[in-house]
Amino acid sequence: MSRVISKVTTYFKQHSTAEWKHYFLSTHFWGPVANWGLPLAALGDLKKNPDMISGPMTSALLIYSSVFMRFAWHVQPRNLLLFACHFANFSAQGAQLGRFVNHNYLHYVEDPVHHKLMMKKEVLEHEHDAEVISKAH
């Protein structure tokens, strides 16, 4: 472990403080940091009902992330932070698109999130019906 730490500290010592300050104050750093909201939101949406997934928007975000992954790879110097952000978003949006297609068209895999939400809905409806009946008597 100390060998890894030694290599990391050697790497940081090779570059001056001014270079790091320039990097952390540039759009090469803050652009990807701001973009991390997209994959984080998509990952959070994996636990939501698939009825709420927008197919066209998810497809647009897949295309957007694939284009900017290519851009981040080809720009000089390479922006690996931006690449990682869009790779994560591409993966999360791909999972969402898979859920959307399965839920609306294929019905191959039972979505555990949708199943759990439907069970909660049935329990609430049953409790509501029982409450209405008890008030009627």
UniProtKB/Swiss-Prot annotation:
Pfam family, one: MPC
GO CC annotation: mitochondrial inner membrane
Keywords: Membrane, Mitochondrion, Mitochondrion inner membrane, Transmembrane, Transmembrane helix, Transport
Keyword Amino-acid biosynthesis: no
One GO BP: mitochondrial pyruvate transmembrane transport
InterPro entries assigned to the protein according to its UniProt record, in alphabetical order: MPC
Entry's localization field: Mitochondrion inner membrane
Role, per record: May mediate the uptake of pyruvate into mitochondria.
Family affiliation: Belongs to the mitochondrial pyruvate carrier (MPC) (TC 2.A.105) family.
Full protein name: Probable mitochondrial pyruvate carrier 1
